[in-house]
Amino acid sequence: PDAVVLAVGATPTVPPVAGMDSPKVVDCVTALTGADLPGQRILVVGGGLVGCETALGYAQAGKTVTIVEALPDILSAGIPVPEMNASMLRDLLAEWKVTLRTGCRLAQVTAEGAVVTGPQGEATLPADHVVLAVGFTPRPSLAGELAGTGMEVYQVGDGSKVGSVMTAIASAYTVARAL
């Protein structure tokens, strides 16, 4: 081939804290694809759009849900959420009684749940499952190995830079037009 287009996507980011190998830890992709998590208490780490939508889904399924967000407010990092959507999502989280723990960081996953640190110090939050929604990391690709082969190599979508479906489509379109 004269050119190779790599669209390898991204993987959920796993924070470097103790307990990530626990069977109670689930990434957001697994959670959003309809994973039935046994138990009642779900702790979602990350208050961006993916974390909030995941939390809302489990709350609507009858689970008791807490969001732990390191920043002072949810929906304040990552891809900007239009204000009307953010307002509606905040209202739905309140209506479904999702607990928000902002300004808190995950310190450890334990048999009881998770240890978080925040303005009031350290606290253990009981949880049957901990869902990680702290972002995505571009998946490694063959771009480096293909360099110097004489082929044109293009990376598109989340494989080059994590974004939205719109940015993925735009990057693929740009490459397709160039070819």
Predicted feature locations:
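Rossmann-like dinucleotide/flavin-binding elements
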Residues: 3, 8-24, 29-80, 116-179
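N-terminal glycine-rich dinucleotide-binding loop that anchors FAD/FMN and/or NAD(P) in oxidoreductases
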Residues: 19-20, 24, 80-107, 177-179
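A conserved short coil-to-beta-strand element within the FAD-binding core of flavoproteins
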Residues: 10-15, 102-113
